[in-house]
Amino acid sequence: WLSNEKWERFKELNVSLDGKNILDVGSGNGYYAFRMLGEGASKILCLEPNLMHVSQFLAINKMMSSESIRMVPERLEDMALKTTTFDIVFSMGLLYHQRNPSKHINDLKEMVKEGGKLIIETIILPDECGLFLEPDLSRYASMPNVHFVHSDIGCKTLFEESKLFLRNESVAIKTTNQEQRKTKWMPFKSFESALNPKNNNETIEGYPAPKRKFYVLEK
């Protein structure tokens, strides 16, 4: 992934991170946490259960020597965190992997202070697909463990049910094989192989090709 492209899309939403206490759920190797730090965040707690990603973070932070970012190798649902602790909570690229999307949204909401923000970034489908799609065999665009892919209206319905207020949203951006591509460090199958070779508006499974979108929500 060219992770900087996603970050630039977030920055267009003009959400101030200056002085904020942030929770980044499913943070990968911590790339976005370091970008948050660069935007003036005070403290960032990263939750990432994948130990390879945790190892990458530790290697990066060995050079960065930041005491403002901590990473814990746990899932949100397994943590006994104090609720209403964070000014901003991020969930990027997680919603479609949830067996219970409503619970995920509510678990995130519990971590946000009153008046704080929840940032959701996810794949969305066209509204004509209904509120959500349940992919056969839980596979979508060659990704395993994809249980629900929501439309824009489906996402907004989830947020309304959780009594979250939509304050801003990005445009929906189609994922390209320039943003997610093979490199000499990652020579395996990538996004290009996830699309129908005869119609790049469809996934290899025949579903609408993914677009990604940010939502800025307030508690």
Give short role names for the model-derived ranges:
Residues 20-28:
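Conserved class I S-adenosyl-L-methionine
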Residues 123-146:
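Short, glycine-/aromatic-enriched active-site segment of Class I SAM-dependent methyltransferases
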Residues 163-193:
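Conserved catalytic loop of SAM-dependent methyltransferase domains
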